[in-house]
Amino acid sequence: MKGNGTQGERKRNNILERKQYSSEKNSSTNNTRMKRTLIIIAAVMTAMTPLKAQNTTAEHNLEVAKQLETFSTLYNYLDMMYVDTLNAEKVIGKGINSMLASLDPYTEYYPESETKKLKRMMTGKYGGIGSVIAFNFKEDACVIEEPYYNMPAQTAGLKKGDVIVSIDGEDMKGKGTPYVSEHLRGDPGTSFMLTIKRPGEKKLRKMKITRQTIQTPSLPYYGMLTDSIGYISLVEFTEGSAKEVRHAVIDLKRNGMQSLLLDLRNNGGGSLTEAVSILNMFVPKGTSIVKTKGKLTKANREYKTGDLPIDTIMPVVCLVNGNTASASEITCGTMQDLDRGVVMGTKTYGKGLVQTPLELPYNANMKLTTAHYYIPSGRCIQAIKYKGEGKEEVVADSLRKDFKTLHGRTVKDGGGIMPDVKVEPDSLPNIVYYLSAAGLDSTMVMMEYVVDYVSKHPTIAPARSFRVSDADYETFKQKAINDGFKYDRESERFLKDLIKVARFEGYYDRAKPEFEALQKKLRHDLAAELDYHKDIICQYLTSEIVSCYYYQAGAIENSLQYDKQVREAVKLLRDPKRYASILSPEKTE
């Protein structure tokens, strides 16, 4: 038996060697063909280059050909000889992602399985139920956080706090938000069975929900702040954003708007063409808005307004912050460069790069950084230089160059858009952050209180005027205390760090009584802290309750009355002389 086994082994090895030789031969043949193809490509690319640059270009193209050939040969060997069978999509996908990660954060690869993700990003559309979900620690499951108005989740009767028990019979206990979200999404028109547990009810609820095309609202709210000042909240630039803004501007003007507050805070950008179309409403036809400059000639473009505007003289204030980026920076930066509006708030993010979506073989896609953009003054506001190999360099203030607006005001490139009027937002205490942010409060005290409140109050006052009463807040406060709500107090953390340093430097023993006294003073007194921060906690609690009755639009409308930056913008728009002086040369605040 042993001899037969050895003979069988030899036979199998001979077959394996022949297969391996055949694979190596095929690999060698493929590599030779690839090499010839790459050399031809390199030659063609060189021929298209001016003579004085041909030597450098030829060397570059040859190096590209060599590296591609090396990569192809390397993976062929891995596939042929590695001890375990490789998943080509995963292994090569990781290689691609590592390569792109060394460039900039915006150049990304999307395999066929992730093409829907790119489409959602570009259009703001996806197939689903239209609801924000959050993970509930106490239930160890995801819950409905915020159903969007008039979308499947809301029309099916889902409410804030509903626990997602199962989807099409699959148990969702312990599953995180990405997993549950992926199962809630799907092709529009498809249906699924959802089982939920509603707080306060013992019996589970089952419902059949049909997915629809969900368009996340790029303009969740607009309205009149005063008799003459309009307000528009624009949260992203996706397909149709300009159409929404146009409708809002026209409607607000019909209702008496004489000046506008355009809120671009936390707007991460999106479509450049949508930004140009929005600016077209406020500047004359034929105005140059933005130029893009890249490596290829076709990346060099100039975008001008092509339609008649709605209003070129109405005062406009653009509210911005550190999360205002890309297309929203083109919008506020152009308003600043053309002295068409005042920019208020804090410095913007500083993204002056343009991405182009490209199709790849086998239904894969990529989003590729192809150009820098330059707003009307000629400046690029990119704040970070990506130097390859994952290295970043923030543009130093000393290297930022001066440019001039239409009226001669000095503005700078690099580092984002500096506001004409700097207004810091109200600071957010840690206790409020922990109470309101999903995933930080293990007691879920705010969500549970809101769900209970809504179950006991069929209706509330209009969104703009509703406010939690003192009695309601006292009930919330007692619930937080009874439920054992805790949060990370920065003062305690800093004191612990200080004690460590004092021990290391040998001062702790001498100051021990003082340290212990300070520790005692800083111990949690939750009741006192909830009283001290009552006003701002009430604001967040009120907003959460309002969203259950009037959805996202109502929550925004309610919050505006407490917004320090909005108040300052209204004050400015009520003062025409100050507004005009800011847009005069060298007049900034």
Tell me what each language-model feature is.
Residues 37, 52-67, 71-88, 111, ...:
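Cleft-lining beta-strand/loop regions that shape enzyme active-site pockets
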Residues 1-8, 15-61:
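Bacterial Sec-dependent N-terminal signal peptides
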Residues 79-143, 191-211, 216-221, 560-570, ...:
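Extended, small/polar residue-biased N-terminal targeting/export presequences
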Residues 73-81, 85, 89, 94, ...:
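Structured segments of extracytoplasmic/periplasmic soluble domains
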Residues 327, 339, 350-406, 416:
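Polar, glycine-rich mid-to-C-terminal structural blocks
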Residues 129, 308, 369:
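A structural signal for short loop-to-beta-strand junctions that line the ligand-binding cleft
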Residues 380-589:
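Conserved functional hotspot residues or short segments at active or partner-binding sites
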